[in-house]
Amino acid sequence: MIKLKRVYEAAASSDGSRVLVERLWPRGVRKASLRIDAWLKEIGPSNDLRRWFAHDPKKWDVFRERYFAELDSKPKVWKGLVQAARRGPITLIYSSRDPEHNNAVALKDYLQTKMKQAKNSARRKLVA
């Protein structure tokens, strides 16, 4: 299971592994106060893509396409999250004010798609 939480929301035991998925450290948050298990800077969108998007909902669909292309080019960065999500809950921690149009939302969709693809591939191998 993959959950999402804003960096300013309190941690809970039900969060499972908490992973910060931002390239930049969130403003106004002390490292000692943010309860995370990992900070995957490399999984965040590139600086160019992040600046271009600028959290503009009108650019959301194109942002997702470009971000997914970036993720496709670096599977080593996200495969560990897929494995962790299979073992138990993980929570992607993000800093955006917009809960619907941010890289964590896109990343969750991407990871869930990869999990479904792997599951379907395994089923096909069992049937064959």
Q: Where are the model-predicted features located?
A:
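Residues lining hydrophobic/aromatic ligand-binding pockets adjacent to catalytic sites
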Residues: 1-128
